[in-house]
């Protein structure tokens, strides 16, 4: 698994602004330098899916999963890809796997909730709804910290959590995250 210092910040901003062609160009440049760069593979899969280049998105995800087989966000992206290509059953299986690996993935919980509610599985829908509400109640930066913490990125998670606590010293969720990291 490669997590070197290739910069993905410009590509991330481009994705947030729905500039997927630009993002993909930046990410492909990164992947030329390091074809196993985890964040670049993930973001390239996201960009490709938004551009409806589903075969390319799948290739990026497959490469990503060969490097990081326990990355919940990769399974979430695989869920999105299957959803967008009309394969609902596979998408649900991938969303479930994503949530098992990383319980802080709000999009996966939302997809599971919608599926279970539509299929009249009340206990499962209630559980997904509870998870969704919990995740929606915390600030987005803490949700991000939870996600990367679940991926084992302890250093980044600790740094971001300490930054947040400097501005919000009484936030108990942030305190509990920092305790988990320690």
Question: What feature does the model see in each segment?
Answer:
Residues 16, 50, 84-85, 118-119, ...:
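Register position in tetratricopeptide repeats
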Residues 35, 69, 103, 136-137, ...:
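Short coil turns that delineate tetratricopeptide repeat
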Residues 40, 74, 108, 140-141, ...:
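TPR alpha-solenoid repeat register
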